[in-house]
Each structure stands twice: as structure tokens, then as C-alpha cells.
Amino acid sequence: KDVVKWAEATGKPYGVYCITLPLKSSASTTPAPQHVVNHTVQVLSGAKFVYFRDSVSLAVAKEYGCTSPIMEFAPDGAFAVDLRDDEKAEAFLNANGLEAGKFLCCIPRLRYTPYWTIPSKKAKMDETKHARNEALKEHDHAQLRQGIIEVVRQTEMKVLVCPEDQTQMAVGKEMLYDPLPADVKAKVVWRPNYWLTGEAVSVYVRSAGLFGNEMHSPIMCIGNGIPAIVCRWAEQTSKGFMWKDIGLSEWLFDLDNEEEMKGIVPAIVAMAKDPKAAKVTAAKALAVVHQRQRESMAEVGRALV
């Protein structure tokens, strides 16, 4: 709506950069009505360019008749995040006995973000979302928890259970940290409080890698050359498929696919056992990201002349 209002008010052209085009949003339990999808495609068709952050979205746009003259893949903007808060990060790591390059990060996530657990949001509990979360929370975290156990028992690495959003400290404690065996828990740190992007990135870049059920922390890791494994599901839209688009299929797992799930723990352990090889894989993906950033931003630049 805002894009349409702006275009009508100014008469200026517009473009769209790095989006996912879902038929059902990650915050919704039902597909978008057809008229909403049609309107979205109409707005995109009026753009001078549309860059999608995953190839699945690009295919959806074409299927629904989007006619923008330039429709291509371009990586999520978060790959370029360079915020840092080294002072806070180092203080946190020192206080918790975490040494640079000697720990992995793990991020939990429920199927739907339970905003109703954040007092400041003043959100009413969504019974449908809550039921879905409860039904699948063990299913969605069992492999991460086992990955933590195997990393601690098979390597010298420690593990930091940390959040990407304000609901995940509690999820991490319940689903990952508390159930761990005593011998493993001794080498696992649970972060009890939220952090801002700068501190989080400064911790990520000091880790040997990250794994979990989130998307943007892995993006920021790869953007800084740090290995990252992504576990996804249908409720998260198609954004996770960007991992395939940048050459990281081996680090993308669909939790709705029981066969794929079998590879999660081995991938986590491999990352911990051979961090040098993992960094080479991350660097190759980052090279793809940089190439597409250069090419797509060049087109944006031409559109602004």
C-alpha cells in the first residue's frame, strides 16, 4: 500500500530489492487470499526491477504472471551487516569461559514466534499458533540438542545457546539446555538475556560456527565468513532456500522431511571437527553473495541515474 501511495503521489519509478514472495506469510496460519496475491504481483509488475532473496520466490512471481523487466535472485541484505560491539562481546565470552574459535552457537526457534510471551508486545495468545508450537517443539529441537551432545562429547568445542529474538532465551533453556546430561551441560553456556545485533555479530565472528532454526543469524555469519547450518520448515516461507542459491545445500535441512533430518547431527559434528574446511565452504558461499550483490547493485545504480 505504501509503495502504491508513494508512486502515485510522486510519479517516480520504484524497484524492489531482496524479498521473499510467500503465498502464506510466516506470521499467518492460513494462505493469503488470492486477491492479495494478485495485488502484490501487480505492484511488483510495476517495478523497474525486482530482486528476490530466494529462487523459489522468483519462480512464484513468474508463475503468477509478474512482468517486471528485471526479475532475478539477489542475497538478503543482512549478508552485509557489519555492526559490531566487540567490548560487550568479549566481556560476555570472558565471563562465560568461551574462547575464540573454540565454541559453536546454537539458536532455537518455535514454529511461530510467541509474541504473547513478551510483556511489552501486549499480544493476546494465539491458540492455533501455540498448539502448533507445542506439538512440534520437541520434534524441532531434538536434533539440535543431540548435536550439542555429540559436539561436546566428540570434540573440545563448547556450545553457546543464544537467541535471535526476545522469545528464544526461554525456548533455549527449556528445549536445549535444561534436558542436557550433566557432563554435557558443563560445557554449554545458556545466555539468559537478549542482546542487540552488534554484540551478537561480535560473538558470532569469534565462534567456529552456528547452527539452529533461525535464518538471519546464519545470514550474518556467512556474511562474515563464519559457517552456519540452517534448519527450516514450511511456516518460515521459502527464504531458507537462499542457502541452496548460494551453494550451501549441505547446510540446509528441512525439518518437515524426516529423511533430511538424519543429516543434521552429522553436519554439526563435521563443522566442529573440521572448522577450517567449514570456513572454506562459508567463504565460497560468501563469494557468490558478493558477486550477486555487485551485479544487482549495479542495476540499482543504473536505475537511479
Cite the ranges covered by each PLM segment.
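Active-site anion-handling motifs in enzyme catalytic cores
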Residues: 1-305
